[in-house]
Amino acid sequence: MGSFWDAFAVYDKKKHADPSVYGGNHNNTGDSKTQVMFSKEYRQPRTHQQENLQSMRRSSIGSQDSSDVEDVKEGRLPAEVEIPKNVDISNMSQGEFLRLYESLRRGEPDNKVNR
């Protein structure tokens, strides 16, 4: 005859917690840390050496038009300009913020939800 606690026994004990793997996230066995990527935010990885973030960040003093002129002088069109991944929006001008915002929405469908 079994005890009262036998009613709460787990049928397949290997399906649940195993004492040999306590203490960490063991679902992501292929990498050392969890990586989250959403499809609409995906960008191709850079092939050239990453520049210094300070050199990538545009000055908040300059206007949008002057920065576009500098890019054209360097031979880059405004659509081809690299956009930094981590930026401090508190130091950006309104034009710089709008350019960054629009570049992140590139490729999304134009429907009422996204307007």
From Swiss-Prot:
<protein>
    <recommendedName>
        <fullName>Stationary phase protein 4</fullName>
    </recommendedName>
</protein>
<comment type="function">
    <text>Stationary phase-essential protein not required for growth on nonfermentable carbon sources.</text>
</comment>
<comment type="similarity">
    <text>Belongs to the SPG4 family.</text>
</comment>
<dbReference type="InterPro" id="IPR020485">
    <property type="entry name" value="Spg4"/>
</dbReference>
<dbReference type="Pfam" id="PF17325">
    <property type="entry name" value="SPG4"/>
</dbReference>
<feature type="region of interest" description="Disordered">
    <location>
        <begin position="16"/>
        <end position="77"/>
    </location>
</feature>
<feature type="compositionally biased region" description="Polar residues">
    <location>
        <begin position="50"/>
        <end position="66"/>
    </location>
</feature>
<feature type="compositionally biased region" description="Polar residues">
    <location>
        <begin position="25"/>
        <end position="37"/>
    </location>
</feature>
